[in-house]
Amino acid sequence: MNPETKARIDQLVTANKVMVFMKGTKLMPQCGFSNNVVQILNMLGIPFETLDVLADAEIRQGIKEYSNWPTIPQVYVNGEFVGGSDIMIELYQNGELQEMLEVALAS
């Protein structure tokens, strides 16, 4: 990944308490996994920002290197990589996600 792409990702991850790199947008997710993440965050009423990786090939590849995680979507909370769709579902079901997000939004 080039330094410019890394700097863009750094800026997005640090500027937004909850940042989702996904396929599509909040209003029109382009894959089921991205849709799962959007639905969970919407259900919890959590404000979040997204970046459509389908519209940006450098970010689409760069985010995988950045997190050392091979799949999209990718969720960051307070600058920390949380995971993708499966991890978000698991954290939501066991109540950890709500707690993590409440702490993040309070900081």
UniProtKB/Swiss-Prot annotation:
Keywords: 2Fe-2S, Iron, Iron-sulfur, Metal-binding, Redox-active center. This is Uncharacterized monothiol glutaredoxin ycf64-like. PROSITE patterns: GLUTAREDOXIN_2. GO terms for molecular function: 2 iron, 2 sulfur cluster binding; disulfide oxidoreductase activity; metal ion binding. [2Fe-2S] cluster binds at residue 31. PANTHER family: GLUTAREDOXIN FAMILY MEMBER (PTHR10293), GLUTAREDOXIN-RELATED PROTEIN 5, MITOCHONDRIAL (PTHR10293:SF16). It comes from Synechocystis sp. (strain ATCC 27184 / PCC 6803 / Kazusa). Pfam families: Glutaredoxin (PF00462). Residues 6-107 form the Glutaredoxin domain. Glutathione binds at residues 23, 60, 85-86. It comes from the Bacteria. The keyword rRNA-binding does not apply. The lineage of its organism: Bacteria, Bacillati, Cyanobacteriota, Cyanophyceae, Synechococcales. SUPFAM superfamilies: Thioredoxin-like. Belongs to the glutaredoxin family. Monothiol subfamily.
